[in-house]
């Protein structure tokens, strides 16, 4: 029986999950919920099911795999990654995976908070000034490695790819000073399963955010 991944009909928090499911050739189906237009932003599609799915902490995204029902995006990622030994093989690799996992969430949340802020246009110039330092830290952490944890693909690569790609969409030149990050994105997109998935109609690059956001909302 295929796994069921539930989320809004946007890229949001689930792009790394979708990419990991594709990379691992996992059998899954998507349950996509649609949010209504502003100002009401009707969420009844999700709210009508929210407490009927047997989730301990009902939220989106969720993953249902037989008797296993999981919420929280990173918990879902780790569940899939453990099945395929993608959490790092050595202690050093596992430490690097943990660091990037949490750093990527911080970096992602900073962009989310800006894009859902009513003062988006006013705050955007200051936010743009902070991007080079953010990207510099990722570049230095990656160094000359092909992947963030080392020589092999791990779950943190899916998170790093997604957040770096979002920032590049937000500020197209932000990775120009960091060729190793641009090479990393190209290397990731060149993975056979990933490349094939990105050519399908199922791949959702945008919108990144819901209709309530000030950027990438359609």
UniProtKB/Swiss-Prot annotation:
Gene Ontology MF term list: glutathione transferase activity
GO-annotated biological processes: glutathione metabolic process
Localization terms from the record: Cytoplasm
Annotated binding of glutathione, by residue: 7-8, 46-50, 59-60, 72-73
GO cellular component: cytoplasm
Enzyme Commission number(s) from the entry: 2.5.1.18
Principal location listed in the UniProt entry: cytoplasm
Catalytic activity: RX + glutathione = an S-substituted glutathione + a halide anion + H(+)
Binding site residues for substrate: 116
InterPro entries according to UniProt: Glutathione-S-Trfase_C-like, Glutathione-S-Trfase_C_sf, Glutathione_S-Trfase_N, GST_C, GST_mu, GST_superfamily, Thioredoxin-like_sf
Enzyme class at the top of the EC tree: transferase
All copies of domain GST C-terminal, residue ranges: 90-208
Signal sequence, start to end: none
Keywords: Cytoplasm, Transferase
Recorded family membership: Belongs to the GST superfamily. Mu family.
Role according to the record: Conjugation of reduced glutathione to a wide number of exogenous and endogenous hydrophobic electrophiles.
Self-association and partners: Homodimer.
Protein name (Swiss-Prot/TrEMBL): Glutathione S-transferase Y1
Source species: Cricetulus longicaudatus (Long-tailed dwarf hamster)
Lineage: Eukaryota, Metazoa, Chordata, Craniata, Vertebrata
